[in-house]
């Protein structure tokens, strides 16, 4: 199967294009002037809700002990966006994506004629590059994105967590997105997609490799000679991971082999790497899914739910889709491109994702009890708790 029509790509295309536009043979030129103009307007992610401003720095990490599994030559490489509590009024504005990253993403989704490159690339975020950190010791959260998509797609969640007093490391795994910029003018495309969709490589190879990537990242952030100049901000006793789609499956893979990761969140990812039969050592884990991911809707969750041997929750959002947990609904909403099959508004998608993921980490990394996680609440009627 061509990756441009893979399941994840099809879902994203449905998210960003209303059905009349997605129909074969329909021309984007049929848009009304107001709709077309909206796609050239400035797009802004929802503002973070915490008390801190957010700083941002980018790391390029090279694991010379491993050969890249997709290129099958050269060392394994990662691009990492670090976000952290920062002093107000310091730092400079950041870019959401480079023009080439945005161009490749739009082409892959069949949206290059509908959305200008500069609109997506110029999406306004709220981090500040090289901002001065607020002194302290903060829990570390690793974020891993969905298959084929850039780490920037988790920006709204990452910024909110940093504003609430976390250090956040969002990872791009080489050759696993349709386009990620690396040093030296390189833009690495999705070699992994060809191998998994056309070459017979199982998706478990992706999540297992990402688990190893995360352990290497933790080594470089918490070792004797850390790769990040602000590594002293990290409380090494409080580390967790969350991921979207294959990134969520990778949280299980990482936790299964790395005891440093104290808690995990899987946002609508099939568990290609199963939970070990012995469990996760009693560590807390949350399954957070779209409307169709309740019991009976996600077979690997049904299979592995009994193996989660610590505090656990299985939560879904009504009217949501696979990409609800990323930035895409908020961006699509502002561009006049809602998804009729996942009508949860974009701003509400971001709000709920931030609230429940943030509450999980506040409870399990900061020791702050969160009644929000005990069951349904009147102010969140979209949220379903499942106890199979």
What is each stretch, according to the model?
Residues 122-181, 293-297:
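Short substrate-entry loop that stabilizes the transition state in hydrolases
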Residues 217-281:
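Primarily recognizes the serine-hydrolase "nucleophile elbow" in alpha/beta-hydrolase
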Residues 262-324:
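The feature captures the conserved acid-bearing segment of alpha/beta-hydrolase catalytic domains
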Residues 2-30:
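Secretory targeting and sorting signals
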Residues 32-46, 51-56, 64, 87, ...:
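Alpha/beta-hydrolase-fold serine-hydrolase catalytic core, especially in secreted/extracellular enzymes
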Residues 83-89, 96-110, 152-196, 318:
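Active-site machinery of serine-nucleophile hydrolases
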Residues 34-141, 342-346:
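Domain-level recognition of soluble alpha/beta enzyme cores
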Residues 131-137, 182-242:
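Gly/Ser-rich "nucleophile elbow"/oxyanion-hole loop immediately N-terminal to the catalytic nucleophile
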